[in-house]
Design a protein with these regions (language model features):
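Phosphate-binding and adjacent anionic-ligand microenvironments
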Residues: 1-145, 150-179
Length: 179
């Protein structure tokens, strides 16, 4: 999404997961819009600081209805392929230690085409997608998300990130999040 935000004149920023953290960061930056992959969407205008799925849907409809061809606007948005939120159960306190190990290993594992960020766990960005492994803020699990511009990119990124995870937690059982 970052390239699409830049093309529209915005300034994207990656930040820590958690609705209260995102809202606070939006206030610091005076950001008009913020969101998380979990679906929390925050609008500064007319509804500052609250996230509500119905409201976000209505605002999207309001915004695209201003256009001559709303379908063209929606069809122009970037498409991608992603996993649902995945979890790896851990012992109490283990997720943060594992995350630190992943962050330390990343520079020796990934080549120069991969950009690593340690703002919230380990996120590795490639030109065609990203992988994220972070400690949950609420439960003793690692949270994993993978996204690619194509199915092939998604599978490659997921395989590379899971291979890295295997180095710090051999035999890790990856399962769907229980939401």
């Amino acid at each position: 999404w970052a390239p699409a935000i830049r093309e529209a004149g915005g300034v994207p920023e990656m930040y820590k997961t958690g609705h209260s953290l995102v809202k606070a960061r939006m206030r610091e930056l005076d950001s008009p819009l913020g969101g998380e992959m979990s679906g929390h969407i925050f609008f500064k205008e007319r509804w500052y600081g609250f996230d509500d799925g119905t409201y976000a849907g209505c605002r999207l409809l309001e915004i695209v209805s201003r256009e001559q061809d709303p379908s063209a606007v929606l069809n122009a948005l970037p498409t991608s392929f992603s996993t649902p939120e995945l979890n790896v159960a851990c012992a109490e306190g283990e997720p943060h230690a594992l995350t630190a190990q992943l962050q330390a290993l990343a520079p020796e594992v990934f080549d120069a085409s991969a950009q690593s960020s340690t703002i919230d766990g380990l996120r590795v960005d490639w030109a065609d997608g990203f992988g994220l492994i972070r400690a949950s803020n609420t439960t003793p699990v690692l949270v994993l998300r993978f996204e690619g511009h194509t199915q092939a990119a998604l599978h490659r990124i997921e395989a590379q990130m899971l291979a890295l995870l295997e180095r710090v937690k051999p035999g890790a059982q990856v399962g769907s999040a229980a939401h």
